[in-house]
């Protein structure tokens, strides 16, 4: 995973923050993917954040602003999921050349993949005026994550980390 991410930013919303980690663009088709981590401000705030996200209409913008990152910590995590897709595909009217079809997916984030983002978090550009407030993003309590393709809006992975014990 080293070098998978090429840019990142933090958006601050009322009650939660979203860290967006952009992956490199696809070589052939130019699609852009990113991982987003939704971290509630409160340690036990995941259910309330999910309720707020689910109840906000898609065309209604939740007020937010781009913020500078102070401390950045993301735990390592790995999830996998598999299921037999045969019946689901047949119900879509597809004729299958095989008797059974299985789907398996997994996602892994570790310190190698997040270290590059954290190392760049302290880089600053000289400027006049007062320093902007920096917001810490320390995912030491339950959070939501997703991997999304931006052109289509398709979410490829979606999950929750309920016990993000930091290593």
Walk through the language-model features, giving the residues of each.
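Secretory/exported precursors with cleavable N-terminal leaders
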Residues: 1-167
């Amino acid at each position: 995973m080293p070098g998978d991410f090429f840019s990142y930013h933090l958006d601050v919303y009322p009650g939660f923050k979203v860290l967006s980690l952009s992956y490199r663009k696809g070589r052939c088709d130019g699609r852009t993917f990113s991982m987003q981590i939704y971290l509630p401000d409160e340690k036990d705030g995941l259910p309330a954040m999910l309720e707020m996200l689910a109840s906000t209409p898609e065309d209604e913008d939740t007020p937010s602003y781009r913020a500078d990152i102070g401390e950045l910590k993301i735990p390592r995590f790995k999830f996998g999921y598999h299921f037999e897709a045969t019946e689901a595909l047949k119900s879509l009217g597809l004729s299958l050349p095989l008797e059974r079809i299985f789907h398996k997916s997994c996602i892994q984030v570790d310190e190698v993949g997040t270290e590059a983002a954290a190392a760049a978090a302290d880089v600053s550009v000289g400027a006049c005026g007062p320093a902007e407030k920096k917001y810490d993003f320390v995912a030491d309590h339950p959070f939501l994550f997703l991997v999304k393709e931006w052109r289509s809006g398709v979410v490829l992975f979606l999950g929750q980390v309920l016990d993000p014990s930091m290593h």
